[in-house]
Amino acid sequence: MGRLAELLRAEVTVPLGFAVTVAAYRRHCAESGLDERIDEVISGLPADAGMDSVEQASATIREAFEQREISTELAAEITESYEQLCVRCVDVNVPTAVRSSATGEDSAQASFAGIFDTYLGVSGSQRVLDAVRSCWGSLFTARALAYRLRNGISHHDMPIAVGVIELVHARASGVAFSVHPVTGKRDRVVIEGSWGWGEAVVQGLVTPDHAEVGKADNRLLRYDVARKTVVSAFDYAAGRVVEIDMPGRLVDRQVLDEEQVAAVTSAVTAIEEHYGYPVDVEWVVSRHRRAGDPVCIVQARPVTVTVPEEPAAAGWDPVAMAGKYAFGTSGKG
C-alpha cells in the first residue's frame, strides 16, 4: 500500500483506497489476547520444525485470528474509512481488493512477494472487516511461518498492514516486467495479459498473451496471441472474483492492441525510472479506459529473481511464471 501511495505522488495512475496500519494490527493483537496465544504456539516450534508441525501451528494461529473479533472502536474506524471510499468511488458498496503488506514483503533481498493473502471483490463493511482480519492472519501462513523460523525472524519484528483498494472493473489485466523474467535481458519490457482480472494470470491458470517492447525505441518486438481458456470474473451473486471458462469469442482474440501495449510499457518504464531498479508490475486496463488514457497500476515490486542474460528455452511455462510472480489470492464472500 505504501508503494501505491508513492506511485500516486509520482503521478502514476493507481486505484483509490485506504490503509489499515501496522499500529491497528498491533492494537488488535494486544487487545484481543492474540499476542499471548501466538507466542504460546510458536514457542513450541524449533527452527528446523517439519512442515507438518508448521502447518498445524499455522492453522491454530489463523483460527485464533478468525475467532477474535475486532474491537468496536477499531471496527468503527475501518468502517468509516470504507464508507468514505464508497463516497469517493460513487458506489454504495464498492468492491475492493483487500491486500496484505508486511514489513519486508517488497524487499528485493527478502523476496517476500506472494507470501501473504489478497482477497478480491470484497464489498460491504462487514465483509471488509472479515477480510482485514483474515489478512492479518495470513502473516502466519505455513509458508510465512516456515520462512521466519528458518531465518530467525520474530513475528513481532514483522507486523502487517492491510490495503483496501478499489477493485478496478477490468477489461484486461496482467503483469509486466522491466527486465525479461526468463532471459534477464534489460533492453525490453515484457508484458503478459489476459481478459478480466489478473488472478488467472499470476496463479498460472491461463496461458496469457505475451508481448515484448524494446526500451530504446518503444518498438513492438513480438506479440504472441495465446489460447486463453480461463478468465477471472466478478461473480456478483457470490460477491467475489471467481475463475470460469473463457467465452468462446475471446479464447483466441488478441488482448491488447498497440496503443494499449504502449500504455503499459510507458507505465512500467516510468516506474523503473522512478525507483532506479527493475520492477515487476500488475496492471489493469479498465472497461472505461479511453485511448490515450494511462493504464491503472495495482502493484509494483522490485524484480526478485536475478538471472543471467542467456538464451532461454522456448515456450510459456505458467508454473514457472507463477512462481516468479504470484501472490496469494482468495475470494472473500
Segments the model singles out, each with a brief description of its role:
Residues 99, 110, 119-121, 130-132, ...:
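Beta-strand scaffold of nucleotide-dependent catalytic cores
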Residues 314-318:
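Flexible linker/loop signature enriched in Pro/Ser/Thr and Pro/Gly
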Residues 1-161, 172, 252-267, 272-276, ...:
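N-terminal beta-alpha lobe that positions the nucleotide/phosphoryl donor
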Residues 104, 170, 197, 304-306:
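Short loop/turn segments at secondary-structure transitions that flank enzyme active sites
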Residues 188, 192-280, 285-286, 319-333:
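Conserved catalytic alpha/beta cores of large enzymes that bind or transform nucleotide phosphates
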Residues 199-203, 306-312:
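Cytochrome P450 core scaffold surrounding the K-helix E-X-X-R motif
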Residues 161-172, 178-180, 240-248, 252:
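Amphipathic, soluble alpha/beta structural segments
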